[in-house]
A protein has these predicted regions:
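N-terminal Lys/Arg-rich, disordered targeting/topogenic segments
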Residues: 1-13
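Hydrophobic membrane-insertion alpha-helices, especially the h-region
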Residues: 14-33
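Short, non-transmembrane alpha-helical segments in secretory-pathway proteins
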Residues: 31-63, 116-125, 186-191
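Exposed beta-strand-loop-beta-strand "reactive/processing" segments of non-cytosolic proteins
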Residues: 57-94
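A short, surface-exposed beta-strand/turn
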Residues: 88-111
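Non-cytosolic head/periplasmic domains of membrane-anchored proteins
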Residues: 103-187
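Structural alpha-beta junctions
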Residues: 188-205
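Extracytoplasmic/luminal low-complexity segments enriched in Pro/Gly and acidic/polar residues
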Residues: 200-258
Length: 258
């Protein structure tokens, strides 16, 4: 048998061995991460929420696996909401070692959004687009509820954990090419609004005046720094551009905001 023919047979043999292995790996991964039925975990999430929040019923969506790789199990994530209020949606996380959820933050966000609405509409106009997002560090998960499964009021838990609770207010009023006078007026209104914002939490304010698929324009500033502003040029200089999705990493902790 010639060397060339032998080499060809060896290559063909390798192909016959490798291809089935690759197919097997793809099937296993697909069954694990795509086709697997997570009904059992979905039910467990609903039971976990009901037990944690004093018998309250929740609707839990279909879990999906995130953060999984060949050697990493990852975790399951589902969107849930109270059975009597589908507007308060939050994430539930389920892993082999722990379960936690964002229900408290969703409730606080909803309450704060309703509380701030009259003041925001007064300053920026009725129908102004805004969101309030409040989260809490994972170590606060058990501290968010009392012994009866009731969520502790934001003011009360902020007295204990303070800056460990991120509080974000974002206002969007689209208008291109703002003049310096308009920028100053916006900041002045935000300063007036800041009197209604909690100062014990890690509070930050965002204002968006221009947006595109990749970039946004406006300002993002911690509450304490917003309240200190008095110079006209400092107010104007707050406005800049940032990449969409990078707002949390926007320069809130630099340029004097350390």
């Amino acid at each position: 048998m010639g060397i060339a023919k032998l080499g060809k047979q060896i290559k063909e043999h390798k192909v016959f061995v490798i291809v089935p292995i690759v197919i097997l790996i793809v099937v296993v991964l697909a069954r694990t991460f795509i086709w697997r039925d997570y009904t059992k975990e979905q039910i467990e999430m609903a039971i976990y929420l009901k037990d944690k929040y004093g018998g309250q019923e929740f609707v839990v969506g279909k879990p999906v696996r995130e953060g999984a790789m060949l050697a990493i199990e990852g975790y399951l994530v589902a969107i849930a909401y109270p059975a009597n209020n589908s507007k308060i949606k939050f994430r539930v996380i389920h892993s082999s070692s722990a379960r936690y959820d964002g229900y408290a933050g969703a409730v606080w966000s909803d309450e704060e959004s309703k509380r701030l609405e009259p003041e925001i509409y007064r300053l920026f106009g009725k129908g102004t687009d805004y969101t309030v997002e409040i989260k809490s560090a994972l170590e606060l998960q058990n501290a968010q509820v009392n012994f009866h499964g009731k969520i502790i009021a934001l003011d009360d838990i902020a007295k204990i954990y303070g800056k460990q609770i991120p509080y974000g207010l974002a206002i969007k009023r689209l208008k291109k090419n703002l003049s310096d006078d308009e920028k100053e007026d916006i900041v002045n209104k935000l300063i007036e609004l800041s009197a209604s914002l909690p100062d014990k939490t890690d509070t930050a304010v965002t204002y968006i005046s221009e947006t595109s698929e990749k970039r946004e324009y406006g300002l993002a500033v911690p509450l304490d720094n917003l309240r200190k502003l008095s110079n006209r040029q400092d107010k104007i200089n707050l406005f800049s551009e940032w990449k969409v999705g990078g707002l949390q990493d926007y320069d809130l902790r630099q340029d004097g905001f350390n």
